[in-house]
Amino acid sequence: MSDSKEPRVQQLGLLEEDPTTSGIRLFPRDFQFQQIHGHKSSTGCLGHGPLVLQLLSFTLLAGVLVAILVQVSKVPSSLSQEQSEQDTIYQNLTQLKAAVGELSEKSKLQEIYQELTQLKAAVGELPEKSKLQEIYQELTQLKAAVGELPEKSKLQEIYQELTQLKAAVGELPEKSKLQEIYQELTQLKAAVGELPEKSKLQEIYQELTQLKAAVGELPEKSKLQETYQELTQLKAAVGELPEKSKLQEIYQELTQLKAAVGELPEKSELQEIYQELTQLKAALGKLPDQSKQQQIYQELTDLKTAFERLCRHCPKDWTFFQGNCYFMSNSQRNWHNSVTACREVRAQLVVIKSAEEQNFLQLQTSRSNRFSWMGLSDLNQEGTWQWVDGSPLSPSFQRYWNSGEPNNSGNEDCAEFSGSGWNDNRCDIDNYWICKKPAVCFRDE
């Protein structure tokens, strides 16, 4: 501000310097001299002119000079006022800068702003007055319910019962006994884990159901029970035999014999088998321990021969395997007609339930070098293979497909035995087919 002020002062100095001389120049005579000197020829022509004209000129010039002096006298005061205003503004700016310096950093301000925003949103989400009243009422009801809790005597009774229960728990078997029980449970769990797969259990359950139905058709219930007891005792006696392989063979024959007994229609045949079992039991009781196994085996062989004279497992031209009968056709039909052909003989287009059954059927078809239909297709949903009985194809059976199959080449939706595995083929192609049904007793004609 000092630099800008000095030029104005210097300009004023030009106007104010040598006031004495300036005052001298303001005398009338000076003006008169100048006027006379400036208009020498005119004055001479006019004869010195009137005095009034000179006074008027002097007055006008004096007014102009006074006005200039007044304006010049105002300049220092305006400059001083401007300087004070600038100082005030500078001080205010300094104070504002200091105040700004004391504010929190930008990140802190943003954080505060965010918190305020969140708080505002939370306040907006507070339940309305009616909701608060509802909560208050629920709290009031809860308080009243607490007041209705059982009295002290009732609580003491509950505590005593808990104490007695704790004491009873303390009387449980000792740790060694618990460990023994735990081991037994572990063994039981392991045994359960070794049970056959679900499909096998279903097959066993179906066989038991069929056996139960056949037993229900026997003529005399008391005779059936007696026969069953005899078989149970015989099974126990067989369990004492030394050789496992021979035991398994005898047990299988007994199982087949039991099934056959359930299927015998005539009372005379049942009595005949019962008599043979009675004789077998009597012979078993009289045999010495060393020859008991051979004698039982011989009796069972004779009994099996007698039974086979009475009936056979499967109809003519059917093949028996593991409780089922299989028919391999000698003519060809498409898949749908093959399903119908099996139904006409009270059978089903073959549904495979086990690896043993698959190996048996694959061997039969490969020996005859025939492409044969099985009861498997994905007609209901592409890529989802299903047996004709409604059961899905087990993931463990996927390995039986030939390499690259099934490929659905040309809309192939039906499965066939092909070579050493399975193949998908068009359902309208003519193939041989295989029917399957449970084995029963068929009498010779």
Curated annotation (Swiss-Prot):
Record field: transmembrane: 50-70
Principal location listed in the UniProt entry: membrane
Binding positions for Ca(2+) per the UniProt entry: 405, 407, 409, 412, 423-424
Ranges where the record places region 9 X approximate tandem repeats: 108-315
Alphabetized SUPFAM superfamilies for the sequence: C-type lectin-like
Top-level taxon of origin: Eukaryota
UniProt key word Metal-binding: yes
Membrane-protein topology: Single-pass type II membrane protein
Residues on Extracellular side: 71-445
SS bonds (residue pairs): 311-441, 314-325, 342-435, 414-427
Annotated glycan sites: 92, 407
Protein's cellular compartments: Membrane
Sequence repeat windows: 108-130, 131-151, 154-176, 177-199, 200-222, 223-245, 246-268, 269-291, 292-314
Pfam families: Lectin_C
Keyword Nucleotide-binding: no
Record-level GO cellular component terms: external side of plasma membrane
Motif (Endocytosis signal): 14-15
Family annotation (CDD domains): CLECT_DC-SIGN_like
Quaternary structure (record): Homotetramer.
Free-text comment about domains: The tandem repeat domain, also called neck domain, mediates oligomerization.
Function text: Probable pathogen-recognition receptor involved in peripheral immune surveillance in liver. May mediate the endocytosis of pathogens which are subsequently degraded in lysosomal compartments. Probably recognizes in a calcium-dependent manner high mannose N-linked oligosaccharides in a variety of pathogen antigens. Is a receptor for ICAM3, probably by binding to mannose-like carbohydrates.
Designated name of the protein: C-type lectin domain family 4 member M
UniProt lineage: Eukaryota, Metazoa, Chordata, Craniata, Vertebrata
Gene name tied to this protein: CLEC4M
